[in-house]
Amino acid sequence: MSAIRTLHQQLIAKERSAVEILTETFAHIEAVEPKVKAFLTLTKEQALAQAAQVDAKIAAGETIGLLEGIPIAIKDNLCTKGIQTTCASRILEGFVPTYESTVTQELQEAGAIMVGKTNLDEFAMGSSTENSGYQVTGNPWDVTRVPGGSSGGSAAAVAAGEAPIALGSDTGGSIRQPASLCGVVGLKPTYGLVSRFGLVAYASSLDQIGPFARTVEDTAILLEAIAGHDPKDSTSLDVDIPQYSQLLQPELPKDKPLKIGIIQETFGEGLDPEVAEAVQKAIAQLQELGAEVETISCPRFRYGLPAYYIIAPSEASANLARYDAVKYGTRNAAADNLVDMYTQTRAAGFGPEVKRRIMLGTYTLSAGYYDAYYLKAQKVRTLIKKDFDQAFAKVDVLICPTSPSTAFKAGEKTDDPLSMYLSDLMTIPVNLAGLPALSLPCGFDAQGLPIGMQLIGNVLREDLLLQVAHVYEQATAWHQKQPQL
């Protein structure tokens, strides 16, 4: 059952007030936060004031929208006017934006109530939320393990029941991988479907904002609220936005069977056998539900990872040049001159992973290496997109595991960057191609840790992804399981 619709019905029936819902939400956050550490900032005072306004509307007999009075968690790389936005970096400690990001503005206008800003890997660079400059978030299913990253705080907040819905950003898997590890639904929309205005940039040709929720229906409702053209974002698509939640049907289409392609290259070396088994069982279940399944080859899929780790750091090195303590950044006052101020500020403010990616990007963009690395990576990106185009000429949806493994122990991969990068092996090619993809729960391993499967769609086919995911979700009970904190 949709948490949004349940809360909405309770509000309009006056079974619960918005203030009661928010008060209970913050009580739960205060109870579990010492273990989970999903939030960097809580906005209790502002949230309760907004809730009181919703209650006043209801008392006056006014109609309220579906998201009015609904608590939401926001990743701390989305600018929120008057509320600290740190990107989990010490260099932005105390930074308070003077403007609102488009997505948070749209949610405010829809009446959703932000309960706080969630933790992430610094500047969204990471796959475990261990790169935060402030705290390490725990996975609600086992707090000694990571929630995934970089949107680990948002995924953990939804899994732990601290908010029914949340926003994250996805550059190479940063919504889908934590959704998989935390046992929730996470969707990366088509590049350009959701405005990036007010999202602190990591890799501008890859970044995209998307929703987290416990159910597919809530994911669809949240996507409806944030999708749409925005003149403030030059990459924003000017397309009609469907009512995704209204299009969800209880069954797959009967007249023209849905064709699902299993990406052959994703079931091989490096994939946890329990993950492979759970996803194969989910595929078999989709067949029983009426889908036609065939194996599809995307031969350049495996080259996504090396191409990404040239393109993304290259864009990051340019985007992060602005943190110089003049325009942005906590200034190092001890510097004797301008160059020292730049150097000392960036050395003290950035964490090791951010420094690693800036250096990598600067190297690949340098005169002697641009053609050998950056240009070649862009050619590989084009070939990956061609592979997807050829696949979608044969099938409607592609399917594969979201992550090669379930949640790993905190600290297990921090000294091995390459091992950490492999966490996004299945998700990165989708960002390079600009396609939509969704992760949803499809089982648990022997240790009780969630397993997610990834559905990939053609450009602007979020409606189809949500439909397939909804039918699978209704036929299974994975989404009903909750962690015991």
UniProtKB/Swiss-Prot annotation:
GO terms for biological process: translation. It catalyses: L-glutamyl-tRNA(Gln) + L-glutamine + ATP + H2O = L-glutaminyl-tRNA(Gln) + L-glutamate + ADP + phosphate + H(+). Transmembrane segments: none annotated. SUPFAM superfamilies: Amidase signature (AS) enzymes (SSF75304). GO terms for cellular component: glutamyl-tRNA(Gln) amidotransferase complex. GO terms for molecular function: ATP binding; glutaminyl-tRNA synthase (glutamine-hydrolyzing) activity. Pfam families: Amidase. Keywords: ATP-binding, Ligase, Nucleotide-binding, Protein biosynthesis. The keyword Protein biosynthesis applies. Its EC number is 6.3.5.7. It is an enzyme of class 6 (ligase). The active site is at 75 (charge relay system), 150 (charge relay system), 174 (acyl-ester intermediate). HAMAP family: GatA. Heterotrimer of A, B and C subunits. Allows the formation of correctly charged Gln-tRNA(Gln) through the transamidation of misacylated Glu-tRNA(Gln) in organisms which lack glutaminyl-tRNA synthetase. The reaction takes place in the presence of glutamine and ATP through an activated gamma-phospho-Glu-tRNA(Gln). PANTHER family: GLUTAMYL-TRNA(GLN) AMIDOTRANSFERASE SUBUNIT A, TRANSAMIDASE. NCBIfam families: gatA. Belongs to the amidase family. GatA subfamily. This is Glutamyl-tRNA(Gln) amidotransferase subunit A. It comes from Picosynechococcus sp. (strain ATCC 27264 / PCC 7002 / PR-6) (Agmenellum quadruplicatum). The lineage of its organism: Bacteria, Bacillati, Cyanobacteriota, Cyanophyceae, Oscillatoriophycideae. The gene is gatA.
